[in-house]
Each structure stands twice: as structure tokens, then as C-alpha cells.
């Protein structure tokens, strides 16, 4: 959607006025200005100008950490990045971020943005925000009253995603790796670990049958829950091949990443497998954005995450 009508300009001016008032009062202006803009102009997100390059990050776990890693690395390399780090990850928060960095005519001041996106808000955001790169970290069960089953969230995201977006997905997650059948994709994964099991030992595993033919799915190995590597012995469905494959050297705290251009060595920011996935996600995004191996490596050299 394009074009700025009178309703849009009223929404923009009122939201900027609200933002100024909140800041004068030393209040958080990361939610209400956007909420007001969308209340006045329901398709506000579709009409306001956006940066040339947009990265969105959604998923059950790790999206905030991944966003912060990407943002820190980009800023360390001289990028001026629009983001919603300070506030809400729903549509009003994204709108507030765009209002804050727009001129009075609705023109965006920045050329690149990274937005953390709440999974359930995908249907309110993706129809208007067309990300260059759409990242999904993983999909797991969450609080039952909010997100219910991961398939429910999968369907919300999958039905909302623009086909033009290049997806960056976890090949080890047998739910989220199936997002965006028509989209271009880049996959990341972590190679088999000594601690992986031959079969699931968790009480919860939401992928026990093949998502294609619905017959029993064979796991080559299971890391936890439905994270692992699998192949269907009936229809041939299998875990996607990783474009960025992490090989962990836990003794020396090194993350070796096998990429399309060769193997790269990074300092592991954490002993936790969860944060190693987060780091690998960020590395994949940054390399796809065009940052050099040396620049990305330097960004993680002195970073440590407190467990």
C-alpha cells in the first residue's frame, strides 16, 4: 500500500505530538504514539515510508537476544539502525519506532531497520511491513492461554509472511523450518553433538509424525524437544540442509561455521546451546546482509552473555 491521505497525516502529526508530550513528561514513548496512529489511521503502517532494508525477527525463544546481537554488530560497523529495542514488539511498537524516525511528511530518516516481532502480531504487521529478511528463531509451546500449540503460531506466521521476503530459518527446528514454502530461504543449524540422543527423551515432542505424509517420523538424532535432524522413511521428507552449519568446540569455546564461502571461526558467547543458536542466527543474518567475516568476528570477540 502506498499514498498518504489526510487521515495518514492527521495520525502522523497527532502521534508525533503525543511522543513529544510523553518525552517532556519523561515517560516511555515506545507504544502509545503508534497505538494512537493506528487508531486514527488503521493502515498507517502501510502508508508510512519504511527503510530500504528491513530485518524482522520472530519466534518463541531468543528473538530479543538475536535482535540485540544484530543491532550491536551493525552499529559497531557504522550503520544507523531504526529499531524497536526500547519498546513494544507488537504493531503499535513498530509504528512508534517508525514515527520516531520519520519526518513530518512521513519520510523515513534511516535506511535499515531491525524489528522484533511478537509471533501473534505477525498478522497485524506483515501485511504492511515487507521485510527484506524475515527470521524465525524457533517455535515451541508457550503459555497455553496465549500461544496454545506451536502449529497455531506457525499458521499465523505462515499465512502472513510476504512471499517476497528472504527467510532465515533454523533447519534443526522441525516446525519453523517449514515456513514460507514459496519464499527464498537460508538455513542455519548446529552439527550433531555428543550429547544428542537417538530418540526423544522429553515428555514433549510436537513433531513425531511427518509434516508431509503424516506417518511416523524417524529422527537421526534429537537434541531437545523437536530440535534435531530427521527423515521420513515413507515419503523422503527430511530436515533441510544448512547453508550455515555450526560445529562446536566446547573445550576451546569456538563456534566454527561452515558457510557457502568457507569455514569461519567465532568466539562462543555462551556455554548454553540456546544462546549458541542465537549467535549462529545473528551470524547468518549479518553475513547475508553483506558484512565481512572479519567484521562479524570482531563484533563477537569480546561479547559474553550472562547465563
At which residue positions do the language-model features occur?
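Gly/charged, well-structured mid-domain segments that form the phosphate/adenylate-handling core
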Residues: 237, 248-252, 259, 285-307
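Acidic-glycine-rich active-site phosphate/pyrophosphate-binding loop
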Residues: 64-76, 247-263
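Cys/His-rich short segments
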Residues: 191-254, 269
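Short glycine/threonine-rich catalytic loop with a Thr-x-Gly-x-Asp
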Residues: 202-205, 270-281, 306-307
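Short amphipathic alpha-helical segments and their helix-coil junctions
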Residues: 12-21, 253-268
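A short glycine/serine-rich beta->alpha loop
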Residues: 80-85, 265-273
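Phosphate-binding loop of NTP-binding sites
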Residues: 2-212
Amino acid at each position: 500500500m502506498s499514498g498518504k491521505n489526510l487521515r495518514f497525516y492527521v495520525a502522523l502529526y497527532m502521534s508525533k505530538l503525543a511522543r513529544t508530550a510523553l518525552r517532556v513528561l519523561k515517560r516511555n514513548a515506545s507504544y502509545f504514539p503508534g497505538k494512537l496512529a493506528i487508531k486514527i489511521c488503521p493502515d498507517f503502517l502501510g502508508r508510512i515510508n519504511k527503510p530500504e532494508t528491513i530485518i524482522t525477527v520472530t519466534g518463541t525463544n531468543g528473538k530479543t537476544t538475536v535482535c540485540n546481537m544484530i543491532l550491536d554488530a551493525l552499529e559497531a560497523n557504522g550503520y544507523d539502525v531504526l529499531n524497536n529495542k526500547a519498546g513494544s514488539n507488537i504493531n503499535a511498537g513498530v509504528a512508534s519506532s517508525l514515527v520516531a524516525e520519520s519526518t513530518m511528511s512521513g519520510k523515513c530518516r534511516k535506511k535499515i531497520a531491525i524489528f522484533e516481532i511478537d509471533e501473534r502480531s505477525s498478522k497485524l504487521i506483515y501485511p504492511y511491513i515487507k521485510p527484506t529478511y524475515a527470521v524465525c528463531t524457533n517455535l515451541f509451546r508457550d503459555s497455553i492461554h496465549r500461544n496454545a500449540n506451536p502449529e497455531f503460531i506457525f499458521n499465523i506466521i505462515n499465512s502472513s509472511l510476504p512471499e517476497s521476503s528472504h527467510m532465515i530459518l533454523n533447519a534443526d527446528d522441525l516446525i519453523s523450518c517449514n515456513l514460507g514454502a514459496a519464499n527464498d530461504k537460508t538455513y542455519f543449524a548446529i552439527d550433531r553433538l555428543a550429547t544428542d540422543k537417538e530418540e526423544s527423551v522429553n515428555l514433549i515432542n510436537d513433531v513425531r509424525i511427518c509434516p508431509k505424509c503424516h506417518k511416523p517420523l524417524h529422527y537421526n538424532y534429537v537434541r531437545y524437544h523437536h530440535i534435531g535432524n530427521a527423515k521420513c522413511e515413507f515419503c523422503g521428507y527430511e530436515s533441510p540442509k544448512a547453508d550455515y552449519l555450526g560445529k562446536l568446540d566446547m573445550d576451546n569455546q569456538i563456534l566454527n561455521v561452515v558457510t557457502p564461502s568457507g569455514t569461519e571461526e567465532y568466539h562462543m558467547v555462551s556455554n548454553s546451546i540456546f544462546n549458541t543458536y542465537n549467535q549462529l542466527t545473528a551470524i547468518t543474518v549479518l553475513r547475508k546482509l553483506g558484512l565481512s567475516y572479519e567484521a562479524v568476528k570482531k563484533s563477537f570477540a569480546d561479547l559474553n552473555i550472562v547465563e
